[in-house]
Amino acid sequence: NITKILECIRERGFQYFVIDCGWYRQEGVPWDISMGDYEVSDILFPEGLEETVRQIKAAGLIPGIWFEIETVGKAAKAYSMTEYLLKKDGKPLTSYFRRFWDMCDPWVEEYLTKKVIGTLKKYGFGYMKIDYNETIGIGCDGAESLGEGLRRNMEASSAFFEKVKREIPGIVLENCSS
């Protein structure tokens, strides 16, 4: 499908082509409950993501990709890694079918560095669309108050985005949320 889209938009003045949510979706599992593991879908990219990115670049466009780095969907293996997820009253903070990474945890930073920054570098992405589709609520454990725990987690998220920019100079970050 991306190949057809690239043909349609060729020479129309676009600068970026962003692969949106679901690029990691496995067969029979909706994209919105499977974020967190970020393994490229063999179903959606049977020739691999490398080939798709090559086609995007060959069309004269800068390739981009979607991440929702701070959340984990219930179908992801990461959903059960509760030692690395935010908690409220000692239980994993869960909203509908999502949980949230503890962005202050060094293991989480290392994991996301591998999954997010590693993916961006490996495939040569020059644009990252960052989404956030769930409310985290009033706060989380880990500080003298739920609000302070939340503030610290958001500060760690911001630090991770700065790390992305340091590791990949010139990358464009689009931050959006619903």
Predicted segments, located by residue:
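Aromatic-lined carbohydrate-binding/catalytic grooves of carbohydrate-active enzymes
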Residues: N1-I117, Y127, G137-I138
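Aromatic-lined carbohydrate-recognition surfaces of secreted/lumenal glycan-active proteins
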Residues: V18, L61-K74, E155-S178
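Short, ordered loop/turn segments at secondary-structure junctions
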Residues: G22, N133, S178
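Short glycine-enriched, charge-decorated loop/helix-capping segments at active-site entrances
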Residues: Y38, E144-G147
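Flexible, glycine- and charge-enriched loops at secondary-structure boundaries
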Residues: D42, D105, G147-M154
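Phosphate/ATP-binding catalytic cores across multiple sugar-kinase/actin-like superfamilies
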Residues: T119-Y123
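Proline-aspartate-enriched helix->loop->beta-strand connector
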Residues: G124-F125, P169
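Conserved N-terminal glycine/acidic-rich loop preference
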Residues: F125-G139, G149-V164
